[in-house]
């Protein structure tokens, strides 16, 4: 769920999730246009991942995970919730791996700057 996603971003990327809201064309609710940088692409890929989840709502599904040898491992018996966890885990690692691409000019980017056709997932 979105609360757990926020927690994973802090655990894995070491950054507050506030930096990911209203960023670029995809970080936040919804998304259109072309991702503006690698950080925005992390959000695009996360949106695509959520779009492929079936049998539960990824924004509200509560999943389980453990930390093993410094790595986060998604667990539980529900395949849908495990898929949501994987979406969140991969996105948090993407944010971590692309920290240096974050650019304040894309924070609160006006929607008029995201008018291009979206690429397919």
Swiss-Prot record:
Cofactor note: Binds 1 Ca(2+) ion.
Enzyme class: hydrolase
Record SUPFAM superfamilies: Phospholipase A2, PLA2
Keyword Chloroplast: no
Function: Snake venom phospholipase A2 (PLA2) which exhibits indirect hemolysis, induces mild edema inflammation in the foot pads of mice and slightly delays anticoagulant activities. In mice, not lethal, even at the highest dose, and exhibits low to moderate myotoxicity on muscular fibers. PLA2 catalyzes the calcium-dependent hydrolysis of the 2-acyl groups in 3-sn-phosphoglycerides.
BP-aspect Gene Ontology terms: arachidonate secretion; lipid catabolic process; negative regulation of T cell proliferation; phospholipid metabolic process
Active site: 46, 88
Disulfide bridges in this chain: 25-114, 27-43, 42-94, 48-121, 49-87, 56-80, 74-85
GO MF annotations, alphabetized: calcium ion binding; calcium-dependent phospholipase A2 activity; phospholipid binding; toxin activity
Organism: Bothrops alternatus (Urutu)
Residues noted as binding Ca(2+) in the record, renumbered to the chain: 26, 28, 30, 47
Sequence similarity: Belongs to the phospholipase A2 family. Group II subfamily. D49 sub-subfamily.
UniProt catalytic activity: a 1,2-diacyl-sn-glycero-3-phosphocholine + H2O = a 1-acyl-sn-glycero-3-phosphocholine + a fatty acid + H(+)
Classification of source organism: Eukaryota, Metazoa, Chordata, Craniata, Vertebrata
Superkingdom of this protein's organism: Eukaryota
Gene Ontology, cellular component aspect: extracellular region
A Pfam family reported for this protein in Swiss-Prot or TrEMBL: Phospholip_A2_1
Protein name: Acidic phospholipase A2 SpII RP4
Record's keyword terms, sorted: Calcium, Disulfide bond, Hydrolase, Lipid degradation, Lipid metabolism, Metal-binding, Secreted, Toxin
Major location category of this protein: secreted
PROSITE patterns: PA2_ASP (PS00119), PA2_HIS (PS00118)
SMART domains: PA2c
Organs and tissues of expression: Expressed by the venom gland.
Subcellular location(s) per record: Secreted
Enzyme Commission number(s) from the entry: 3.1.1.4
CC cofactor: Ca(2+)
